[in-house]
C-alpha cells in the first residue's frame, strides 16, 4: 500500500497507475532571492507563474523557485586553506536593504577550502567555494541549497524568545 500526497489536479489518476519516483523528498531551495518572492505551499514563485500563465496555473508549468539567471553581488568570506564544517558562512549577499543573506556549507559537509571565488557577481548556481572532503573527494558549494522540508535545519543552540515578534498582521487559518 502506498499513500500519495498530491498538490495538483488528479483527473485521470486511478488505482493501478504506474508511479515513477523522483528519488528526492519534497524539498525547497534556500538561497538569495527567497525573501523577495511570494510562494505557494510548495515554493512555486507566484509572480513568475503569473507572468508565464496568467492568474491560473497552467497544467505542467514548471518554474524554478529562485531566479537562476540573476547575478547577485557576492562577498566571499572564506579563503584557500581554511577548514570548514557544516553551517560555516561562505558568502554574503545583500538581498534587501536591511537583510544580508548568508550562504553556508551544507550541514553534512566538512572539508578544506581548495578554491574560493573572488568577490563579484554570481548566480545562485555558480560555484563559490570548492572543498576537499575528508575522503579526498572534492565538492563545489553554490549560493543555494536544496533542503527536504521535513528535515529540520540543525542548530548548535536554540535561544528562547525573550520578546514576542509583533508584526501587526492578523492571520486566520480555518
Task: List each model region and its residues.
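P-loop NTPase nucleotide-binding/switch module
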Residues: 49-107, 123-174
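A generic structural motif
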Residues: 1, 25, 98, 108-110
